[in-house]
Amino acid sequence: MREYRNVSRRGFLKAGAVATAAVCSGAVSSLSPSSFSPGSFSLMAADTAAGPYGSFKMGIQSYTLRDFKVAEALEISKKLGLHYWESFPGHIPIGTVPKYIAEQNELLGASGVKLVAYGVVGFDGNESKAREVFEFAKKIGIESISADPNKDEATFKLLDKMVEEYGVNIAIHNHGPGAKYDKIDDVVNAVKDHNPRIGACVDTGHYLRSKENPVEALERLKDRVFGVHLKDVKDAKIFKILGEGDLDLVGCLKILQRIKYKYCLALEYEENPKNPVPDIDICLANVQKAIAKLG
């Protein structure tokens, strides 16, 4: 998933209003059983402590459903039994106007899906732009912003100020070979001398692409882990269904269990965007199998 900088709600308001009306009326007409292959939506249980995901807040990075309008994407998530969302800006753009916030909260409330994380968003030393993002996050109830901040002192000084003021976490997202935060050390060194609310969104697939160990990333970042994108890759370059690549899924979940991870555990599946649900079903089944091995 690419990083978004200064994404606003302009150009999305009309679509957002239509989507809100569709969810509230139940009229998501384009979402029909014929849209997906047999077996889709087989995982219907809620992710509660007694459910198939144990204590984990199993959710989805909405970029997985990027080819669907927001109302459709929320409906799919609900039918999959996923009640936590990390939204990418293409589904819910940043905006702080009270009417817009009310519309988004109504949309989310009607869907039964809770928006707990958001991103990926770029940051520099511009306080007005940063404040707009944090204001939006605070008003809509977001716990953590997945971020790709500049590495300079001014940017991190500003982020120290923002997380303290708003009580919203910054989770630095690693984005594979050549990115600013390619290696585990890049993130560890970036956060170590800053506010405890500045931490990491560990993207397991991108660490595999960078030939880094996602289990090690989780071990080293510990209580600085504010987000996880569960993604699988084979041979450092081929995106796969979760559980069919090189990711040590059980190992990752063991560390998350040990550190009492309480934030969204977001599946992010970037393949087959026009019909991802059958593959998502398999991904989620593999997560459930891995959790069952934790004891």
Describe the residue ranges of each PLM region.
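N-terminal secretory signal peptides
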Residues: M1-S8, P33-S34
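Active-site acidic/histidine proton-transfer and metal-coordination neighborhood
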Residues: G16-A17, A21-C24, E72, L107-A200, ...
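Conserved, mostly hydrophobic/aromatic
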Residues: I60, S77, L108, A137, ...
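C-terminal segment of N-terminal export signals and the immediately downstream linker at the start
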Residues: V28-D67, E75
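Catalytic domains of carbohydrate-active enzymes, especially glycoside hydrolases
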Residues: A73-F88, I140
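Hydrophobic faces of well-ordered beta-strands that scaffold small-molecule active sites
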Residues: F56-Q61, W85-S87, L115-V120, I145-A147, ...
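Glycine-rich, proline-tolerant flexible connector loops at the mouths of alpha/beta enzymes
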Residues: E86-E103
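Gly/Pro-rich active-site loop or hairpin
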Residues: L74, K180, I184, L208-K262, ...
